[in-house]
From Swiss-Prot:
Residues 164-759 are annotated as: Glutamate--tRNA ligase. Phosphorylated at Ser-999 by RPS6KB1; triggers EPRS1 release from the aminoacyl-tRNA synthetase multienzyme complex. In monocytes, the IFN-gamma-induced phosphorylation at Ser-999 releases EPRS1 from the aminoacyl-tRNA synthetase multienzyme complex, allowing its association with the GAIT complex. Phosphorylation at Ser-999 is specifically required for the RPL13A-mediated interaction of the GAIT complex with eIF4G. Phosphorylation at Ser-999 by RPS6KB1, is also induced by insulin through activation of the mTORC1 signaling pathway and promotes the interaction of EPRS1 with SLC27A1. This is Bifunctional glutamate/proline--tRNA ligase. It is found in: Cytoplasm, Cytosol; Membrane.
Amino acid sequence: MAALCLTVNAGNPPLEALLAVEHVKGDVSISVEEGKENLLRVSETVAFTDVNSILRYLARIATTSGLYGTNLMEHTEIDHWLEFSATKLSSCDRLTSAINELNHCLSLRTYLVGNSLTLADLCVWATLKGSAAWQEHLKQNKTLVHVKRWFGFLEAQQAFRSVGTKWDVSGNRATVAPDKKQDVGKFVELPGAEMGKVTVRFPPEASGYLHIGHAKAALLNQHYQVNFKGKLIMRFDDTNPEKEKEDFEKVILEDVAMLHIKPDQFTYTSDHFETIMKYAEKLIQEGKAYVDDTPAEQMKAEREQRTESKHRKNSVEKNLQMWEEMKKGSQFGQSCCLRAKIDMSSNNGCMRDPTLYRCKIQPHPRTGNKYNVYPTYDFACPIVDSIEGVTHALRTTEYHDRDEQFYWIIEALGIRKPYIWEYSRLNLNNTVLSKRKLTWFVNEGLVDGWDDPRFPTVRGVLRRGMTVEGLKQFIAAQGSSRSVVNMEWDKIWAFNKKVIDPVAPRYVALLKKEVVPVNVLDAQEEMKEVARHPKNPDVGLKPVWYSPKVFIEGADAETFSEGEMVTFINWGNINITKIHKNADGKITSLDAKLNLENKDYKKTTKITWLAESTHALSIPAVCVTYEHLITKPVLGKDEDFKQYINKDSKHEELMLGDPCLKDLKKGDIIQLQRRGFFICDQPYEPVSPYSCREAPCILIYIPDGHTKEMPTSGSKEKTKVEISKKETSSAPKERPAPAVSSTCATAEDSSVLYSRVAVQGDVVRELKAKKAPKEDIDAAVKQLLTLKAEYKEKTGQEYKPGNPSAAAVQTVSTKSSSNTVESTSLYNKVAAQGEVVRKLKAEKAPKAKVTEAVECLLSLKAEYKEKTGKDYVPGQPPASQNSHSNPVSNAQPAGAEKPEAKVLFDRVACQGEVVRKLKAEKASKDQVDSAVQELLQLKAQYKSLTGIEYKPVSATGAEDKDKKKKEKENKSEKQNKPQKQNDGQGKDSSKSQGSGLSSGGAGEGQGPKKQTRLGLEAKKEENLAEWYSQVITKSEMIEYYDVSGCYILRPWSYSIWESIKDFFDAEIKKLGVENCYFPIFVSQAALEKEKNHIEDFAPEVAWVTRSGKTELAEPIAIRPTSETVMYPAYAKWVQSHRDLPVRLNQWCNVVRWEFKHPQPFLRTREFLWQEGHSAFATFEEAADEVLQILELYARVYEELLAIPVVRGRKTEKEKFAGGDYTTTIEAFISASGRAIQGATSHHLGQNFSKMCEIVFEDPKTPGEKQFAYQCSWGLTTRTIGVMVMVHGDNMGLVLPPRVASVQVVVIPCGITNALSEEDREALMAKCNEYRRRLLGANIRVRVDLRDNYSPGWKFNHWELKGVPVRLEVGPRDMKSCQFVAVRRDTGEKLTIAEKEAEAKLEKVLEDIQLNLFTRASEDLKTHMVVSNTLEDFQKVLDAGKVAQIPFCGEIDCEDWIKKMTARDQDVEPGAPSMGAKSLCIPFNPLCELQPGAMCVCGKNPAKFYTLFGRSY
């Protein structure tokens, strides 16, 4: 008998039939799938739609189930109960009497009919399960005792529990509650869609196999077909006889069937050729189309140049004459095409007189030689969509430009207009979807065929183990989003894993060439049955054989040690007693002893194994693993895919398989334990009488979305221990210094290697600065790490920038004098090229010229580095030949010529390295102290032996004599440097940071001091994204976290949030608002209740689905906002007008799992905010609060953060979906030319109070209920990001004093060796005195007394952190009773008398606050203008500004503005490409709207000036 298929309408599932399926599936092959209606298909011609008919049919064909009773009397009784459940029990009026009758019948029975379960029980139970009244009785414990007992007895059984959970219709037959929250994206509600009236279509071209991109289109259309109970048309687009092949039609139909898609109608575009031709002739007669014989290339050029064709003004008669030639297929006709007469000057290329018909004389697969002219797809599609009744045409965004053409054709012909909805095309990394390119692979024999598992075809991915359900879930998760992204295949396979993991049986296979026998001396040969799946008993049992000899993986055996206890999966603990090895040290066998009584499996190694048994022979199997066919993740538009072919993409391994593998059938999916999931591609065949050989079971590996390799041996615990041991063993111990007497050849190699590492480091930095693709950066980093490892192996020490090994230095120092001359010449070239680059940047030269100059500079630097062995440093030309003494000889002081002294010298240097490494790795204090003690002892030994102190050698071989001098000069150099604002300041700072960081010499015995990258390496005006990332990390505001989109707010940034919180909290309390806290978790029911409100958040809601390893009965959401949590409580608390107003606020965190690229502060998945929610008796009270709160938000920005904002109201399109209107404050970031929403305050009207029933008795009309008026308002940590973007410069943060946690930093200067201890202590005391005095004046102050950093380093550090004022004090200042204050905002230095410290600094801080606000206000003023036309507005946008434009307020118009202002793809790289959106309708516009003014769209009168711009 053929397999049956039960189709279930998820909105109204037939529980009776589903229960019957559960009880007969052991006897009958039947599948269940979702569809539009409840239907059991028996064959192509026979199907049942009546539920009772389905039940009877299933019970009769599964005779052993006994569901239809055992005799005629029971048949009759069962029929009675089927009718009873469909009539009496389903009627609300008769429910009580029906339940009484049922209770009476069950008083002495376990089942309704006979002594076993029958259809009667299934049907009645299902009806009660779906009855809201019955469910209410159950909750209130009002049910009759016998019915309740019977209902509970059945509900506890596995089949009822399974169906009842998966298809939960409790009280509502139209609700589906899956086991857990489905991972689905947001599906747009189709405009104008009505239940039962939606018609969609899937129109593939029969020119190839369907691939996964087509599958997305088909499944999306099916989604709307099913959800709207509509109609799906499968239409073959056969408008091109050259490409159309009948063979492919059959293939596509098979592919569609594989996807379980059932179209309601099959059609061909060719069915309508006559009609389409008539429409074409109508356009010719109306002068809306013309025939053109311009050659194709010339036509293309004319369209690009917007030049009209010479035939465009032909008469209708001339056009008809040429059209007839086309229809005949004459020589002249073949050179012609029919073109629409639209607009050759249009900005949209698709509107420049597109081709409607072309002449092709090839025979058509369906119409033969009947026609010689064929319509283009773009002309035929809108006509056929209209004729066939398509209501909604779903198309990928690549057709976006053609939408205007689609609608023009509809309007020109006067036919019915379908609605077009766009969704994103599926772009997959390492994949080509072009039919032409896929055909090339097949023709070249690089793949096995169109169903090759490496292919993205439907057949290919299904053969590789993709399930239709997994594919559906993946498509559902994408939703109908328009965001075009390149996706990794891992995402698809991860969805697939969710489908196969719960049901795939577990088996074992071992790598045949590496198996090791284990002799378990006390084991007996026997067989036991164990679960095929450890967590799903429904998968069944499998036989497992045990014997005295078993086989394990060689990789596992290598991890064992004698005496170790190992867990053999499905057996128990076994002790390894002996390990036998051959002469090569390879393990040949193991001896073991059972220890099954020991049940402690927590820290043992878990391994798989197979027994040697004559009763169950191991099955030969071949595991096939496939890799991507294309090695490059994303191919450029003009790149040749053939250059990136992976010639080694298929790997096979011969395995020793589980005996159970002999029963696998083609297409069965299993999991090989500790190897992954596999699909059976070819079942095992026993020895053939023809070939005398057995055919192995071919298994194809199914990717599961993980990015790390599967563990192949040992356990996690053991692996951790092994790694720990390795790290311990590799920790620095006392070791001899690397030999100094290297050969010349070795020194030469290390020098070249050092240069190669340095050059590769520059390459990596350049790629990161350019925001190159991740794969390019990863490849460069990998090469860098390889070079570093090679360098370490060659020299015996780590690579350090600016510190080449002794061997490398030796090479440099022994170069000939001619090399020195070359080095000097190269040095001068680098310096000259640097000047060229700086000049080009200063002149704002084109990016291409700057890039070319920079590349030339990098090339010269690399050449200089290779020649000299060190980095190019401005102001440090290469030393002459005679100045480079040999560092090896220099390393030995004059009195240290003895060999033992040389060895001891090297040991001291080596131990110094150990100390530095331990400190860098933040090792424990004990370890560092121990290493330091050893270093001191070695130094003492050296002094005792040689009579002189040990002195380290610098990287160049000369002692660092000038280090103290440099440190002393650092302050004066910094002070004398002219400081400018903005660019100048940034450039100076970056230079000073670069040179100042290494100014402090090395400590004794520690060699040269390591350079640290303290300053910013990106400029705000050149690379805003990289600059922003560096500012927030280097200023210690943010620490990145291992969960994407979540960040650690360090004290430096959290203190800003505290300042905002303190101010705002105090102000709202003055208004009568109280603080509270509501739970972070939201029930699914609460969220669903307000699904319209949370629609925008739906794809971003994060769900908790498990407690430990236990699935929750119902998933729980983490709040994206708190309306759904708070308002039900409001409804309880508000009973009378006296209970109003309710004004609550909470400071909390929320989670919105955005799929967009996260940015700290600006767009994060978890963020801190305050959310206020109020309820009032009148509209006016709520409206007053909306504006009061908005003004407080404006004060936060303007008074605390020194950022000017524009106050206004959101447009209808941009307002909060659940509110009446939304007010907002908008800030502007000139560095990006974009605005950013600062905070919003919403008037919710009565929308939520109606939803949550927040009602009170009207005091004016007793007995009449009124709904409360509500408002909500929120401010987030985004404020901090805005502050960074607005005020930050190329030196780092600039903090407004009112939110700075440190307003003044005190830094002691002038501490030198010449300074006496008394003076040093006096200076420190003076610094602390300033601290006490300023704290007394309520100035937040910190003193930096760290003695391991120079003053110059500290200056840079605190400038980077944005501290408003730096207070410098030195010995001379103390004598003069004064100090120097340096402003962060301007760099201005002020000399202030000590006695005026408090008053003057308070004044300086206020001046800084005012200056920052004034500067930002001027910035906003110059970047916000009025534009009255779209053309002017576009220019304003391109200049990086925002504009107030006359606007009608219509949503369609706003969409049009956004579309028209979006940049094309060919603009300069890095420019913002998104269209402009409305920011707000300003309360105080820049100018008044003139009477009669029109909206920029030119269609409607303008209602108000509205601020538009590109936005974050």
